[in-house]
Amino acid sequence: MPHETLLDNQGWFKKLARRFGPGHVVNTCFLIVMLFSTLLTWREVMILKDAYVASQRNHLGSVANVLDRQLQFNMDRLIFLRNGMHEALVAPLAFSALQSAVTQFEQRRVRHFWQLELDKRRTLPLYGVSDQFVARTTLLSRESRDLANELTATLELGYLARLARSSAMLTLETMYVSRSGFYLSTLPTAYGSDIVSRYYQYVTQPWFIEQSQRRNPQRGVRWFTSAQPYVTDEQKKVTASLPLDHDNYWYGVLAMDIPVASLQRFLRDAAEKDIEGEYQLYDNHLRLLTDSAPEQQTANTLNDRERALLAREIEKDTLGGLRLGTHYVSWERLDHFDGVLLRVHTLREGIQGNFGSISIALTLLWVLFTAMLLISWGVIRHIVKNMFVLQNSLQWQAWHDPLTRLYNRGALFEKASRLAKRYREARQPFSVIQLDLDYFKSVNDRFGHQAGDRVLSHAAGLIGSTIRAHDIAGRVGGEEFCIVLPGATKAQALQIAERIRQRINDKEILVTKSTTLRISASMGISSAEEYGDYDFEQLQSLADKRLYYAKQSGRNRICASDATQEREKK
């Protein structure tokens, strides 16, 4: 029993040794060491990456907080004005000046344009249009029972808007636009037809139209940026608007224009100490509003594909980061602006920074260690290379006929079937030529098999040198060949077949030391365009059938259609 066990163990070790030879052992050891060194390096890289991402978010967060606080200050002012006007609308003051303004409105409301002003030093003027102008659209209306209260509340708003002005504000203009045909603005309007055009411009802006109860059921602050190019004499701006409602009735819209230039100056000041990275402010449609790049420097803008990738990420979270080519983009949604702030960090800035220096040192260490392993692996690489050469040689022998050096039957059918499927999907022509050497058996009988082999090799060489570069040819039987012509119509296949026939027929072969021989070939042609059938076996069978008829018709000829056969029979 022990002797039998020893034999079993020896057999098991031999099997293991055959499967895992010296080359495999060295390769396995190399891979294990390489794997562990790579894993350790990768762990350090991931830690470094997390630290880099956290650093980018911290830089972005500090600038975003400063910008958000400034925007919050402006939004609080807008809400304060709305609340003050709402209180004035619910409980209007019984001042004689306000009552007098209501009387003046009743007298002037039919005019094409009009103006009401209580005190030039303490309040803002009220501008309006006629009843006829208001009646042109259903968006506007003077049918409110609280029209007088709204008018006095707007005049009171003039006091608040003048008092609320501050040098710390980013706003260019604050205005209230009523659906009843009047407006109040911190920017004066020249008395005249400009009042009508300005009111029309206000009520046709998206920030006014989109504040209806149907389009803004939440009745909160909304931000708007114009999708159309700005005219040359008007600076680019964004608008925050807030509806005024009471008892489920929409009176008008309070709005605040913020110049993009003000946002740019504020953004540059906030990012002044951050020498790396560029900050960019986008609206809710990911249109670039402004950036912190110096005037002489071009901003790193995003292309359409990058914006689409960023939009998908923004939908998932309020902040994050994304690698876009050679840029790392960290982003954060602002709480008091319907948009997103980006920090774009380029690869050059990353390399020049602290994280770049650490990354370079870590990479060099890994490269040096890997180089040492690769040097020790050189001998095995040479062995593997020899194995590949042997494998390729065996593969060639498995796919080719050793005598003619063309594809054998199995390889030809496999490659031709794949080509036929591809050309069928592309709806391109596909043709097949079946070729047979005439009277080949008599060559073997008269001159021997060596002469027959010489004839086959000679014919294969002529076929290979005549067909196109992307055509394939193979030996499918004794003296029978098949030529696949992808992309060739039936007419083109006929031309190629004729060239092959002529070349074979024109060349003489030296079969013995003193004997030459001239051979000929018969061919049959089939094409997918005839019946719309791309099945290679069917095409080869049809070509073989026509080859048989070509031999019956006298040999050294080509048969390309069934119609030719019928004509020859008649």
Swiss-Prot record:
InterPro entries on file: CHASE7, Diguanylate_Cyclase, GGDEF_dom, Nucleotide_cyclase, Rev_trsase/Diguanyl_cyclase
Top-level division of the source organism's lineage: Bacteria
Active site, UniProt feature: 479 (proton acceptor)
GO molecular function, one term: GTP binding
Listed Gene3D superfamilies: 3.30.70.270
Catalysed reaction equations from the record: 2 GTP = 3',3'-c-di-GMP + 2 diphosphate
Entry-linked CDD domains: GGDEF (cd01949)
Name the UniProt record assigns to this protein: Probable diguanylate cyclase DgcQ
